[in-house]
Amino acid sequence: MAIEIKAADVMKLRKMTGAGMMDCKKALVESEGDFDRAKEIIKEKGKLVAAKRADRETSEGAVVAKIQDGKAIIVGLGCETDFVAKNADFQALAQAIAEAALVNFPADKEALMACTLADGRTVEAAVTELTGQTGEKHVVAGYEAIEAPFISAYMHVITGKLAAVVGFNKELDAQVAKGVAMQVASMNPVAVSAANVEQSVLDAEFKTAVEKTKAELIQKDINAALTKAGINPAHVDSEDHIESNQSKGWITAEQATQAREIIKTVGEAKAANLNMQMIENIAKGRVQKFLKENTLEEQGYQMGDGKTPVKDIIKAADAEAKVLVFKRVSLSD
């Protein structure tokens, strides 16, 4: 005999799990009114949905930043669609996870997943249950935490998918501090200053700069030789372009053959006679440019004229103030 499921029981289970009304009713019917079993059914449904949608992109969602007593956290909760991201239950879970992160201050995302929410569920369980409720993949896509004497935060109010927190060595004018947090959010620096950039990053940038400089010098000689031969370099800058432009009648078959020969012979000759000292000097300059554009202190302040370095903006507000640390979470990167 089928057990009668009362509306009050459905509401009770919904309050316990956060699942949808129909999912709660189905779980109670299947469990014959056993609440513990019904909760397990809902949890298993969430795991099943999560497994089926494991390869889905989660570029939508909510990013929440919170500050309290010299500590700050950012949590990014991702989902598949903007529709679900705006759902009240989804937004509430993002806030609840952020609160748990601020209270427990876990060391990393793995530790955050084991934290307990105010309703008694772990973060992992709550995310899985919401996955079952919405039918979309949900994931804690980002988590960052900092400690500092003074902290400012910025959350992008339009998209809700980006936030940054910045820690200073001392209290700073609120408007300036928030502006620096906005700088971090919008410009995504790699470090506070050049001294804080990891050597592996510098090595990779130098290597890239060397290869780019080599390619440019080789291409410069090739272009000069092509132009001297009466061939437009733009018409033969790739094999696809050579074939396409030949079919359009922009270059002849003879010019195509000649261009290929010039590209090969001139390119090989130049590559064998590159001035590596000059190339490395150019590469070093490019690394310095990278540091200026990608370290917070040296970046042009975007909330001002876009040219004045952030460090000068901070110094003008307080000569003793400086940035100690920053973190950023974005669902769109």
Language model segments and positions:
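N-terminal assembly/interaction segments in proteins that build large macromolecular machines
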Residues: 2-333
